[in-house]
Amino acid sequence: MAEGNNKEEVIHLNNFPCHRGKEWMAVREGPITISDSSDEEGIPMLVTPATEQQEDDLDDDVILTEDDSEDEYGGFLDLESGKKEGEAKPGPSSKQTADDIVNPRLEQKVIILGENGLLFPESEPLEVQNQSSEDSETELLSNPGEPAASVDDQLIGEEYWLDHPYFQAPNPQPQERTNQVVPQERHSESEMGPMFFRHDFPEPAFPRPEPQQEGIPGPASPQPAHPLGELEDQQLAIDEDPGPAFPLSGPQEANLANMWEQEAAEVDQDLIPLLVKETEARFPDVASGYVEEIIHLKNYYDLNVLCNFLLENPDYPKREDRLIIHPSSSLLASQDDAKLPKIDFFDYSKLTPLDQRCFIQAADLLMADFKMLSSQDIKWALHELKGHYAITRKAFSDAIKKWQELSPETSGKRKKRKEMNQYSFIDFKFEQGNIKIEKRMFFLENKRRHCRYYDHQALLPAVKQEQEFYEQKIKEMAEHEDFLLALQMNEEQYQKDGQLIECRCCYGEFPFEELTQCADAHLFCKECLIRYAQEAVFGSGKSELSCMEGSCTCSFPTSELEKVLPQTILYKYYERKAEEEVAAAYADELVRCPSCSFPALLDSDVKRFSCPNPRCRKETCRKCQGLWKEHNGLTCEELAEKDDIKYRTSIEEKMTAARIRKCHKCGTGLIKSEGCNRMSCRCGAQMCYLCRVSINGYDHFCQHPRSPGAPCQECSRCSLWTDPTEDDEKLIEEIQKEAEEEQKRKNGENTFKRIGPPLEKPAEKVQRVEALPRPVPQNLHPQMPPYAFVHPPFPLPPVRPVFNNFPINMGPVPAPYVPPLPNVRVNYDFGHMHVPLEHNLPMHFGPQPRHRF
């Protein structure tokens, strides 16, 4: 048989030219080796003659081993389709019976060949006795006239070689299976009891039934053949009345159910912890051990079934520490937690000093990267930057790049590489926050010859991580620079060709790649869209980003917004949009937790609000927003009056809320800083700031002319223009007076306590202080006092000053006063000792008066 071919060899005895009783007996003493090729020597197969049966000595049996395949079994081997089913068939041979006893796990097939070579299939079900292997061996060996021991040995050897994978077929064909009959003494079922064989190797927990063909009974599933050594510890399972695999009844069905439960329990040992973990992640408040108990009691091995059971029975036992959240809960997951951010090794404030080993490796790597720098300078910079490789290399790279840009050329021609010499230097500079490191570092005369190199696997984990981080960041920075250069070249090409496109908002000219568009293809630059979205989302609180073209009613597609807007603006836009959509659909049912502002939907008739936020889980009253455990059995007013401090706090909260107007449509709080009293919410609703009613336009306000601040004499409508501070103060005073009057009525005048902030004492009047005298500079030399002002005895005609007719007694007109310099202690504003002039006269006073000597 060729190597690699696992097909079984079938021996047809009718093909021998001579009678089976002549030449066969002559050569039965020696083994026969059957091989497909003379060049290849396979495993020898011993062919021994079967023991002759007493009923019919003309028919022999050929024993074929069954294939291990579980998908194809129970087939029918049809050697001749024209054979009738009603013909008589001989019984099994004693050789077959002996082999069944020796090898109970081996499922064999018996094909009975007649003299004409036709197959006689068995049509009647045969009874199989529940007999142990020892009894069968004893009975077989006690039969006189037959060499039982030799037959058994030959049978064992034959089946062992046939079970070898060398003789197994690659594509086994479906074959017919028959039960073997051992002519032995029948025992009662009560004595032996039904026994079922169980494999040692793992099998499916729920075996599928075997289809029956041609009404031939057989076992429920095929039993693979094994060597005899593996079968010594196995039990022999023989059914007394073989029948179809399904259905079973009586004790057989009970034993089979027990076997299934036992195997299913083994499989579910790993499934139960997983089910408990996933269920507790979805129901974090369930009591510990309750889920596992439900799984065992109700046999719920499906996550959906467990969740439905807990949802349908909300009164399940809850854990006492309800605020403790399961760490794997999906409610705690977010986009930031999904992927932990990596350490930014370029941020000096987040770095911690490394140990000496990392410092040495980082210094060796830097000395190999910068061979023209001194090792002392490299170690100094590395020490100043806490021994981190990435940030130190970036600082050196920036300094070298700046030196390459600013260093002068030695000649007029541009060189590809600058020459370095001992007089060259770089200015190492690192600035980040309050940290500033500077040092001038000179280049070496020659490059460093000896450097220590490290294999990537030999680096310490911290140094390896920083090296990978630096390479990744440098790659990203290079790609970004290339992208910016490409955009610049693209814009220059657009400008050269005159193909720049105008923005419909700022009317600037941009290339097409820097523009975005609305659904109607109106083009806008990205900067205009970013500013428009930022103002709409953060300023107006709107989520509707309509087109900025005046006549267009379209909006910007979400794909365009995701490409243009930054992440912060985009997330806020989605948040606003979700809030408006939920508020529009469930305006009356949307409730927010007073502690964490977590939104949830609650029926209008439900008063208790349980916060679904796993970090909060507080139960509060929907109306007064007080804790439900203190509110149970009391109304909101009774709860407020029960505690004086809480009552006062509630009144003060009302006074604080008086400054805030809430939209009647979406409940958004509004505060007026300036403008008219017509308030517009982001949801589109309009309300009056004074009376807080819903309005539409300006018809609600007074339309008559009147003086500012004076009431209208013709109508009682609200004023369009008022001071918001005065309106809020009036409303707060009204709430305060009502609360104080109610407190006096209940507790009396003696126990009255003021509600609200204490009264502010009027500011004390400060006596008016006259203007301080003009400070006189303290000169080094004392200034001589001016002469007394004396009027001349008679008027003199005015003399126009000319360059050569100045009067002798008249000095130059002084310049205006200049304050002294802050850093100069001496003002040098000295008066002339021999020219008595009045320095304090204003400039428009005219010429100085004359003095008599």
From Swiss-Prot:
Gene: Rnf216
Phosphoserine carried by residues: 407
PROSITE patterns according to UniProt: TRIAD (PS51873)
Annotated control of activity: Allosterically activated by 'Lys-63'-linked di-ubiquitin.
Annotated localization: Cytoplasm; Cytoplasmic vesicle, Clathrin-coated vesicle
Annotated organism of origin: Mus musculus (Mouse)
Official protein name in the record: E3 ubiquitin-protein ligase RNF216
Binding site for Zn(2+) 4: 663, 666, 681, 683
ZnF (IBR-type) intervals: 571-636
Top-level lineage group: Eukaryota
Cross-link (Glycyl lysine isopeptide (Lys-Gly) (interchain with G-Cter in SUMO2)): 89, 339, 342, 413, 418, 436, 447, 473, 607, 646, 654, 753, 761
Gene Ontology molecular function terms on file: transferase activity; zinc ion binding
Traits of the deletion mutant: Deletion mutant mice are viable and grossly indistinguishable from heterozygous littermates. However, knockout leads to infertility in male but not female mice. In addition, RNF216-deficiency leads to down-regulation of the gonadotropin-releasing hormone signal pathway.
Sections of the chain in a coiled coil: 463-479, 725-751
Biological classification of the source: Eukaryota, Metazoa, Chordata, Craniata, Vertebrata
Pathway the protein acts in: Protein modification; protein ubiquitination
GO biological process, alphabetically ordered: apoptotic process; proteasome-mediated ubiquitin-dependent protein catabolic process; protein catabolic process, modulating synaptic transmission; protein K48-linked ubiquitination; regulation of defense response to virus by host; regulation of interferon-beta production; regulation of postsynaptic neurotransmitter receptor internalization
Region (Disordered): 33-102, 125-152, 165-228
Residues noted as binding Zn(2+) 5 in the record, renumbered to the chain: 688, 691, 704, 712
